[in-house]
From Swiss-Prot:
Family (UniProt): Belongs to the class I-like SAM-binding methyltransferase superfamily. Protein arginine N-methyltransferase family.
Lineage: Eukaryota, Metazoa, Ecdysozoa, Arthropoda, Hexapoda
Recorded GO MF terms: histone H3R17 methyltransferase activity; histone H3R2 methyltransferase activity; histone H3R26 methyltransferase activity; protein-arginine omega-N asymmetric methyltransferase activity; protein-arginine omega-N monomethyltransferase activity
GO terms (BP aspect): chromatin remodeling; peptidyl-arginine methylation, to asymmetrical-dimethyl arginine; regulation of DNA-templated transcription
Cellular component terms (Gene Ontology): cytoplasm; nucleus
Keywords of the record: Chromatin regulator, Cytoplasm, Methylation, Methyltransferase, Nucleus, S-adenosyl-L-methionine, Transcription, Transcription regulation, Transferase
The protein's name: Histone-arginine methyltransferase CARMER
Function per UniProt: Methylates (mono- and asymmetric dimethylation) the guanidino nitrogens of arginyl residues in proteins. May methylate histone H3 at 'Arg-17' and activate transcription via chromatin remodeling.
Highest taxon listed in the record's lineage: Eukaryota
Subcellular location(s) of the protein: Cytoplasm; Nucleus
Record InterPro entries: Arg_MeTrfase, Histone-Arg_MeTrfase_N, PH-like_dom_sf, PRMT_dom, SAM-dependent_MTases_sf
Name of encoding gene: Art4
Modified residues (Asymmetric dimethylarginine): 503
Gene3D superfamilies per the UniProt record, alphabetical: Hnrnp arginine n-methyltransferase1, Pleckstrin-homology domain (PH domain)/Phosphotyrosine-binding domain (PTB), Vaccinia Virus protein VP39
EC number of the protein: 2.1.1.319
């Protein structure tokens, strides 16, 4: 591994966090590191010139061990991962043998106490061998990618700068200060800790901020720089694996993903209820997933034409057509993340409720939603549109956060799932079927759609991969669906201009006549044309 620059010492976590999480950051100085040169003769050679400092920090997969020289802590010489299957053994009172990657090392510590503490770090990792609920349901590669993603400040910034999201959370918490005043709060998936700060603003006595990514160290820095370390304890780890010293009065979290359920963070949110006191509160309290059939020929054609790339029989002299079917399947397995005008929806949305106070984790493993839509307009149904609302049910007021296409846009946007075979449906007909969300170990869902026009043999279905969406949003203003104008848009515009007092300006351009003179039988402008001699 190439060397990298160390900008700061590992940030010290609060005493409470250190006591609660045995894998908290720690370091050992004056360590002499030897490498086993000959296992049979037990011959050792010094791996580095001079003594080293070992920097240990918690990671979602175990403990990251970084080695730097005592007299030059500016560069990381080597980085290892101490995992549950790491082989290690004590050698005497001050030495410890450990097998890391392809290196068999002997670490000689400056004191017996250091050796004992390091041994405890390794043993604590080994105690993680029995998989937690999170580990059982999640592939290691997916978890690693997930926590790495949320460990970047840029990703936290993206969420924090979602004004609707952040301001709604703050208003929900501060507007229900009675639920937080002098209370014990648990912040699940705290990230930067912004919700923990809101809880303190509302008068919380103590906040336990749980964060499994490396963002925990940045959250700790914010806590200390804002002088609230006596209020907020940042605990690195997963809620499924850490221990708290007490029950809490309120759990706060932002666990929603695309289509509400993506990332499977809601299960973690429900799991956290094991620390909630009887009659405790959840912020948010419940979520509503809305589903509606939509018509959008432009979107359908866009995806269809992408797949037609594979229909070429002479691409640089190569026949690609054998892959056309698979290409079509792949493009239509992608949910579309963007926004739209709600007038493309052909019926009132069906609402599926997730009760965060009472639903069980297992309830989210297979979510079967029956559908029945009374069609309001004739047209071609290209698929189903999804969005969600969540409610914060407080003692003083209820606050809603909406991702509806009628609400201000958020970083969740909306999601649409296309049908490879659209269906023509008439106003007054009933469209029935189901949406089945089946959880997978990639922290997402396989989404199966089955639709049927009642009283006919017409049906269509599709299965999509929510883990692999197509991010289509461009920032351009949302356009009204074609054919929604019931009056002349040109006349409407000029009428509005007249109403706004622009008669004089337009009159100058039209011989002193009102532009909307056409409304009184029309205006012949041909007399004003200049004819060449």
């Amino acid at each position: 591994m190439s060397t990298s620059r160390v900008n700061d010492e590992p940030h010290k976590l609060s005493a409470t966090a250190a006591a609660l999480c045995p894998l908290s950051n720690c370091q050992f100085s004056g360590v002499v590191i030897s490498q086993i040169a000959d296992e049979q003769r037990l011959e050792f050679t010094n791996k580095y010139k001079g003594s080293c400092t070992l920097l240990c920090s918690y990671d979602s997969q175990g403990v990251v061990l970084r080695i730097v020289l005592d007299n030059d802590q500016g560069h990381v010489l080597k980085e290892y991962m101490i995992a549950a299957d790491t082989d290690a053994a004590q050698m005497g009172k001050r030495s410890y043998a450990v097998s890391l990657e392809s290196d068999n090392l002997v670490l000689r510590f400056a004191s017996e106490q250091d050796q004992q503490l390091f041994r405890k770090v390794v043993e604590n990792v080994k105690h993680l061998r029995p998989k937690s609920v999170f580990s059982q349901r999640t592939e290691e590669s997916s978890a690693s990618q997930y926590f790495q993603f949320y460990g970047y400040l840029s990703q936290q910034q993206n969420m924090m700068q979602d004004y609707v999201r952040t301001s709604t959370y703050q208003r929900a918490i501060l507007g229900n200060a009675i639920d937080f005043q002098d209370k014990i709060i648990l912040d699940v998936g705290a990230g930067s800790g912004i919700l923990s700060f809101f809880a303190v603003q509302a008068g919380a006595a103590k906040v336990y901020a749980i964060e499994a990514s490396n963002m925990a160290q940045y959250a700790q820095q914010l806590v200390e720089s804002n002088n609230v370390q006596h209020k907020i304890s940042v605990i690195p780890g997963k809620i499924e694996e850490i221990e708290l010293p007490e029950k809490v009065d309120v759990i706060i979290s932002e666990p929603m993903g695309y289509m509400l359920y993506n990332e499977r963070m809601l299960e973690t949110y429900l799991h956290a209820r094991k620390w909630l006191k009887p009659q405790g509160k959840m912020y948010p309290t419940h979520g509503d997933l809305h589903i509606a059939p939509f018509s959008d020929e432009s979107l359908y054609s866009e995806q269809y034409n992408k797949a037609n790339f594979w229909y070429q029989s002479a691409f640089h002299g190569v026949d690609l057509t054998t892959l056309h079917k698979e290409g079509m399947k792949e493009y239509f397995r992608q949910p579309i993340v963007d926004t739209f005008d709600i007038r493309i929806c052909m019926a009132k949305s069906v609402r599926h409720v997730c009760d965060f106070l009472n639903d069980k984790e297992d309830d989210l493993h297979k979510i079967d939603i029956p559908l029945q839509f009374h069609i309001l307009q004739t047209g071609i149904c290209h698929g189903l549109a999804f969005w969600f609302d969540v409610e914060f049910s407080g003692s003083s007021q209820n606050v809603w956060l909406s991702t509806s296409p009628t609400a201000p846009l958020t970083h969740w946007y909306q999601v649409r799932c296309l049908l490879p075979m659209p269906i023509f449906i008439k106003q007054g007909q009933t469209l029935t079927g189901r949406v089945l969300l089946e959880a997978n170990r990639r922290q997402s869902y396989d989404v199966t759609i089955d639709l049927h026009i009642e009283g006919t043999l017409i049906s269509s279905s599709n299965t999509l991969d929510l883990k692999n969406p197509y991010f289509r949003y461009t920032g351009a203003p949302v356009q009204a669906p074609p054919g929604t104008s019931t009056q002349s848009p040109s006349e409407q515009y000029w009428t509005q201009m007249d109403t706004q007092g622009t008669r004089n300006t337009t009159g100058m351009l039209n011989g002193g006549l009102s532009v909307n003179g056409i409304g009184d039988g029309g205006m012949d402008i041909t007399h004003g044309l200049i004819h060449p001699h």
